[in-house]
């Protein structure tokens, strides 16, 4: 496997302080991780206070609450990762070992490389979108200030976020600390989201690999042979199902919180673009909206992918077995395998299953809330 294998996830975990080379996913830089969390918390709560100062201003209210929700989600994701880091590290290393063992066979290696290439497309898309949010929050205020300087000869300072800093940001000795603090808060939320969400993508694709390798085993082996082949297949199928179950258990809380808030985030961000006007926050909101859409889609795509690949085992078993030549006893055993495979592996978020229908529900619900906000505005 090439150098790009697990590269996005490894770098993302290292940025937020974890050491992905250890089976326990130990926190290598706790002070840096603490600074990121502190910047998030100190950045989020003033936004809530500022948003609630004038409830009649829906634009200010929705702008600030959309960012507050993302910051809260990133903080929650980090806390979950800290609580479950040993389980996450164990799952990562189990998949590494399974992939290394399977890569000795050329066609198995081809499957592993293809799935990890798909993961890189997903992970890099979200990573680049998240870095776009950071860049927009850092560059847009500067460009707007420079544009004002060109037109009027006066540099008008604007901050990455609109809220009450309790300091006069028009003064240079206050403006630059506020500016850096604001960008760091956005970067912290983005880095923590990248670490968690790209890791979910990698785990999803590499769990899917285990189901795809089972299909290759069905194609390569004579399933009408001895009981050892049936036993080996059932054992590998059990491992794949256990990996999917562990993935669901680890990310259950994260998925639940994400999708309970996601439709509110979408409708609030969309509401901003239904209003006319330009500010330093518009590029930030636009890139933020793109990142949220990619984030939600990647989770639903991953859940649907695992579900469909686990279901495909039943069809593969049925198609590869020569049923007329098989003894009745062995036929019944393989029928039990099919029956188990017809109950798909799923990613649960306590109240819902993460799949493509969930994404449609989020979009429809966000549209309904957007219509409600437009009604309040009128």
Swiss-Prot record:
Q: What is its main location?
A: membrane
Task: Classify the protein's membrane topology as the record does.
Answer: Multi-pass membrane protein
Q: Which GO terms describe its cellular component?
A: cation channel complex; dendrite membrane; plasma membrane
Q: Which residues cross the membrane?
A: 31-51, 130-150, 174-194, 198-218, 250-270, 286-306, 343-363
Q: Identify the domain of life.
A: Eukaryota
Extracellular face: residue ranges?
52-129, 195-197, 271-285, 364-378
Q: Name one GO biological process term.
A: detection of chemical stimulus involved in sensory perception of smell
Q: Which family does it belong to?
A: Belongs to the insect chemoreceptor superfamily. Heteromeric odorant receptor channel (TC 1.A.69) family. Or1a subfamily.
Q: What does this protein do?
A: Odorant receptor which mediates acceptance or avoidance behavior, depending on its substrates. The odorant receptor repertoire encodes a large collection of odor stimuli that vary widely in identity, intensity, and duration. May form a complex with Orco to form odorant-sensing units, providing sensitive and prolonged odorant signaling and calcium permeability. Involved in the behavioral responses to hexanol, pentyl acetate, benzyl acetate, and 2-heptanone.
Could you describe the subunit structure of this protein?
Interacts with Orco. Complexes exist early in the endomembrane system in olfactory sensory neurons (OSNs), coupling these complexes to the conserved ciliary trafficking pathway.
- The protein here is known as Odorant receptor 45a
Organism of origin is Drosophila melanogaster
* Name of the encoding gene: Or45a
